[in-house]
Design a protein with these regions (language model features):
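Conserved MFS/SLC helix-loop-helix module at the cytosolic interface between two early adjacent transmembrane helices
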Residues: 72-110
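Cytoplasmic helix-loop-helix junction between adjacent transmembrane helices
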Residues: 116-153
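Helix-loop-helix hairpin linking two adjacent transmembrane segments in secondary transporters
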Residues: 153-180
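Residue-level signature of mid-helix packing/kink "hotspots" within the transmembrane helices
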Residues: 39, 67-75, 158-159
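Extracellular/periplasmic helix-loop-helix junction of adjacent transmembrane segments
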Residues: 44-71
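Short hydrophobic/alpha-helical segments at membrane-entry points of transmembrane helices
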Residues: 27, 111-117
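Extracytoplasmic
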Residues: 26-46, 54, 77
Length: 180
């Protein structure tokens, strides 16, 4: 049989042995860091309310801006990421979040705080679709397990963030937010 008449073999089916656990663990750790940084926002509400004399409506608006930018934009970013995968968007999302934390740490009033939490939200909306895609690619067909490992990182970060904020931000003030 020459090469022209050889049957084409079916593509190799992925097996659970193809699960790339180091990648899953790394993306879970980045999810932990990302969500830890985000969870600082509600943890510092009492500090912001006391320092700037914000009303509960203003605190609610801070939450609204963060949630709108982190949640509403995410499906649009996810759709774009499906069509044009950009692995560097993981780092880009984290950079937006970091810039938002620095801005929040130095914000002198309400409007700059809104901009800071918007940056943090944009970081989240950029980070999550691509990192979830990476977890799925590393799953080796074990998508439920991969998503669970990925999600544990985010949930742990959401749990640790307020605790660390209580230990760091409350004693050292608003500028210590940039330590996250």
């Amino acid at each position: 049989m020459d090469t022209l008449t050889k049957p084409i073999s079916a593509p190799r089916r992925r097996t659970t042995a193809d699960t790339v656990y180091p990648i899953l663990l790394l993306v879970s750790v980045t999810h932990l860091l990302n969500d830890m940084m985000q969870s600082v926002i509600p943890a510092v509400y009492p500090l912001l309310k006391a320092k700037f004399g914000f009303s509960f409506a203003q605190i609610g608006l801070i939450t609204l801006v963060f949630q709108m930018t982190s949640s509403i934009l995410q499906p649009f970013v996810g759709r774009y990421a499906d069509r044009h995968p950009r692995p560097y968007s993981l780092a880009a999302g984290m950079c937006f979040t970091l810039a938002g934390l620095f801005a929040l740490a130095l914000a002198p009033g309400f409007a700059p705080i809104l901009l800071a939490v918007a940056l943090i939200g944009w970081g989240s909306s950029i980070f999550h679709p691509e990192s979830s895609r990476v977890a799925q690619l590393a799953s080796g067909g074990r998508k439920g397990l991969a998503q669970s490992i990925f999600q544990v990182g985010g949930n742990a970060g959401s749990a640790f963030g307020p605790l660390l904020a209580a230990l760091v931000v409350i004693p050292y003030g608003q500028t210590s937010i940039m330590w996250f």
